[in-house]
């Protein structure tokens, strides 16, 4: 069993960008985490029906983006598992591997979606929730605490870096032939170009 504190940052990462990386680093330093697991989703339940780059490409881009940070580790735990990527299942699998001191990193928008997640009370027993607030994000904590009484004592709020970058915008820029350099690592830009993604 490992009591080392480990951050968990999941997402579609379609593509991963500097906003994701900055949030992971901000939380790692603020909470003195041993490392941060970057976990690309296989099939995200709340995004079923939306077109995504194939999982192997999203995983490869995440690995390229994280290659120069020894505290970031990219995991294929959700991509390797068939079916929807449910957070409570992923956290349980990590617990089963001996990782017991987990910090689930979310944006304020994802926190607002907690009522739509499966097994939210179970998630709160498996990990602390770290919310990185974004510019202008409003969090209705009283309403969430009413639904999930354990949330306030399991919640950590951190003000994150204000990088206004979105994967949706990057995909649109690529489709329009506009540059995405300086918004995602050069290795990711090169990978997108080499594989003709988002055209």
Swiss-Prot record:
Its EC number is 2.7.7.18. One of its GO terms (molecular function) is nicotinate-nucleotide adenylyltransferase activity. InterPro entries: Cyt_trans-like, NadD/NMNAT, Rossmann-like_a/b/a_fold. It comes from the Bacteria. GO terms for biological process: NAD biosynthetic process. Pathway: Cofactor biosynthesis; NAD(+) biosynthesis; deamido-NAD(+) from nicotinate D-ribonucleotide: step 1/1. CDD domains: NMNAT. It is an enzyme of class 2 (transferase). Keywords: ATP-binding, NAD, Nucleotide-binding, Nucleotidyltransferase, Pyridine nucleotide biosynthesis, Transferase. The keyword rRNA-binding does not apply. It catalyses: nicotinate beta-D-ribonucleotide + ATP + H(+) = deamido-NAD(+) + diphosphate. HAMAP family: NaMN_adenylyltr. Catalyzes the reversible adenylation of nicotinate mononucleotide (NaMN) to nicotinic acid adenine dinucleotide (NaAD). PANTHER family: NICOTINATE-NUCLEOTIDE ADENYLYLTRANSFERASE-RELATED, PHOSPHOPANTETHEINE ADENYLYLTRANSFERASE. Belongs to the NadD family. This is Probable nicotinate-nucleotide adenylyltransferase. It comes from Roseiflexus sp. (strain RS-1).
């Amino acid at each position: 069993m490992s009591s080392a504190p480990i951050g968990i940052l999941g997402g579609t990462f379609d593509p991963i960008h500097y906003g994701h990386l900055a949030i992971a680093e901000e939380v790692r330093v603020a909470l003195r985490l041993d490392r941060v697991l970057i976990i690309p989703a296989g099939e995200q339940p709340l995004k079923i029906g939306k077109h995504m780059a194939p999982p192997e490409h999203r995983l490869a881009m995440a690995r390229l983006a994280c290659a120069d940070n020894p505290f970031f580790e990219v995991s294929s735990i959700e991509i390797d598992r068939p079916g929807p990527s449910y957070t409570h299942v992923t956290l349980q699998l990590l617990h089963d591997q001996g990782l017991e001191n987990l910090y689930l990193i979310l944006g304020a928008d994802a926190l607002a979606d907690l009522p739509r997640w499966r097994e939210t009370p179970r998630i709160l027993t498996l990990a602390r929730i770290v919310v990185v607030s974004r510019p202008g994000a409003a969090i209705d904590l009283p309403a969430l605490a009413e639904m999930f009484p354990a949330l306030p004592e399991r919640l950590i709020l951190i003000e994150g870096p204000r990088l206004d970058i979105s994967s949706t915008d990057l995909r649109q820029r690529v489709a329009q032939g506009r540059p995405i350099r300086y918004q995602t690592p050069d290795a990711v830009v090169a990978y997108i170009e080499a594989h003709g993604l988002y055209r």
